[in-house]
């Protein structure tokens, strides 16, 4: 059974001046296709249950680069419920991550994903954030160990801005056994 996602397309504003939005329901669907391709290795699928265009979030550009603060502000705009909340936001200057999530879906299953400009990059970042909601941690790379680095750089959960989409057997088992997947019949 696919896991339902409630999508909030959330443009930014600063001092009342609305910035042009980058996400649309169509780009969200295309990115979700990439997400589902990546997670198909674990036989986990996601579906958009709702896709809502949000009122712009009026927040100074300088405040957006703190990923946990931004996630808290986005999540505070909606009461927690039984849905997984995904906030799709414009690209953010000086943000060193593709988005942010509440690890292990605590206090609620919520993530934001910033715009990267193409379906594959958007979907890979989104798949990474869903990994955190399914209890997966970042993969650290020891670049002095070339063999390990060559393998891990391709992993979906590699920390930072990467293009990896691989999952290990251990990651697949952890995701399938996560509270989030079990909640939706996985």
Describe the role of every protein-language-model region.
Residues 8-12, 49-51, 87-92, 115-117, ...:
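Active-site-proximal beta-strand/loop segments in catalytic clefts of secreted hydrolases
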Residues 41-47, 139-142:
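Surface-exposed helix-capping loop/turn segments at secondary-structure junctions
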Residues 2, 81-83, 154:
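Extracellular structured ligand-interaction cores
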Residues 12-20, 94-97, 164-171:
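Short, solvent-exposed loop/turn elements at domain surfaces
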Residues 21-30, 77, 148-155:
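Glycine-rich, flexible loop segments associated with nucleotide phosphate handling
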Residues 114-186:
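The catalytic-center signature of Zn2+-dependent metalloproteases
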Residues 43-112, 116:
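Active-site-proximal segments of metallohydrolase catalytic domains
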Residues 1-39, 44, 55, 91:
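Fold-level signature of zinc-dependent metallopeptidase catalytic domains
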């Amino acid at each position: 059974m696919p896991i339902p996602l409630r999508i909030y397309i959330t443009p930014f504003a600063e001092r009342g001046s609305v910035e042009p939005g980058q996400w649309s329901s169509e780009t969200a669907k295309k990115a979700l296709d990439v997400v589902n391709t990546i997670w198909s290795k674990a036989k986990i699928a996601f579906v958009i249950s709702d896709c809502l265009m949000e009122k712009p979030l009026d927040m100074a550009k300088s405040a957006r680069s703190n990923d946990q603060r931004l996630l808290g502000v986005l999540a505070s705009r909606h009461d927690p419920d039984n849905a997984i909340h995904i906030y799709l936001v414009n690209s953010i200057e000086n943000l060193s991550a593709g988005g942010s999530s509440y690890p292990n879906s605590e206090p609620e299953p919520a993530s934001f994903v910033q715009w990267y400009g193409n379906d594959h990059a958007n979907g890979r970042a989104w798949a990474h954030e869903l990994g955190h909601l399914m209890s997966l941690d970042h993969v650290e790379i020891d670049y002095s160990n070339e063999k390990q680095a060559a393998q891990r750089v391709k992993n979906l959960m590699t920390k930072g801005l990467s293009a990896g989409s691989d999952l290990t057997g251990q990651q697949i088992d952890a995701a399938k056994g996560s509270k989030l997947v079990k909640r939706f019949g996985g």
